[in-house]
């Protein structure tokens, strides 16, 4: 735990941001100068320098040798990221973050980013119907909202001209932004000529960065949904699939049931049946030597359970998860899909959760769920098209967190050198800008401002799972409740006044009926005093 705490303290000195190609930098000027240091509107200076939020700094990349899996050099824009595009970016101070240091780093809030707040990711099966529907509506909003801050590149850096005279960037909706990012980080390398590609390359899978990269990726996704919805209490839920016999979330109330007429499609009763996928035609891109440009390519596909049973006999079990967590070594041997007794390789799904040994022809753990879904989620590059991807990877991240808490590893266990390209400790994560180093995120999720409901102690879990949602709803309608309370008090006061006045008048009439008649006379002072007293009380 000490080492995790130290990592959390050190993290504040590293620069942060939210995603790929900030809009202010995606132009000829940015490409020509190779500088991405946008102005912060709060003080009108690049990176908020006048307010001490950050400054524009040279990018220094690691020159540690990579593994033998990728023998090429200088032909892929992702090599030595982000130097093909930019060599100067914002470096944010303290708890500040964002591409111009105008936001806060993960877990911190407020105008000065001084407030630490821990958000809780919950089991989607434990959420109320209203909460589930809100989550689905947020995803659909993200699918239909152009992201205001980020764009994607539709061409390689070489295609844009030596001085960036032909920039190739495009708008994209917020959901598909993350589909495209997942495609871009895992795509093949173009070697020149139709179909001539290098396939044994992936900057986010099949080695050490798999877990840290996806952790940062989910945090970005979470943050962007908060921004477009204005709901800063939003968290990505998880699906605890241990021991499941089927796709429990594949219902029309959740992530979409099976279409009765075509089992490969989503039920028309689900909003996801209208979704179009992007970045799924890998071979076509390779043959054209072109990047995915986010053009719609057809409906979302899913046919859970109708996969090759020899490749995935079953959904992973509790025993599989516990064995995986018990493995003490994060990375071993060749540090790729052939590594034995590697926690990362077993959890990713290239090794057995019973023996720890690498297996061929089978997919386990993380990979097993992708294959089991038997559709858009089953190919690496386009897998994020299926919203179940979010639920699945949130649970994978929670298993990573359990391993960190169980073994409390020092930072030094993360491979510094000879991992496959993109996976060494000092390598910046592709394609995030400004920059995140892989090894900086081998640390507890508490340092990043979030927790998982099932990892809380029972008391905290009760508060988060049952009490907090109601308190959040009350907070959202407190102004209405206050107004209703004031109106109710006013009505009660008026009613009370009417009742007192009626009673006073009745008593006065009764006294007049009982009093003997001695002719006309002035009212008694006492009677006048009673009237004044009642009036006073009524007024009070």
UniProtKB/Swiss-Prot annotation:
Ranges facing Lumenal, melanosome side: 20-480
Keywords: Copper, Glycoprotein, Melanin biosynthesis, Membrane, Metal-binding, Monooxygenase, Oxidoreductase, Signal, Transmembrane, Transmembrane helix
Catalytic activity, EC: 1.14.18.1
Positions annotated to bind Cu cation B: 366, 370, 393
Cysteines paired by S-S bonds: none
Region entry Disordered, spans: 511-540
Catalytic activity: 2 L-dopa + O2 = 2 L-dopaquinone + 2 H2O; L-tyrosine + O2 = L-dopaquinone + H2O
Localization per record: Melanosome membrane
Membrane topology reported for the UniProt record: Single-pass type I membrane protein
GO BP of this protein: melanin biosynthetic process; pigmentation
Cytoplasmic membrane side: 502-540
MF GO annotations: metal ion binding; tyrosinase activity
Transmembrane annotation, as ranges: 481-501
Signal sequence region: 1-19
Cofactors required: Cu(2+)
SUPFAM superfamilies in UniProt: Di-copper centre-containing domain
Residues carrying sugar: 87, 233, 293, 340, 374
Main localization (coarse): membrane
GO cellular-component term (any): melanosome membrane
Stated family: Belongs to the tyrosinase family.
Function: This is a copper-containing oxidase that functions in the formation of pigments such as melanins and other polyphenolic compounds.
Full protein name: Tyrosinase
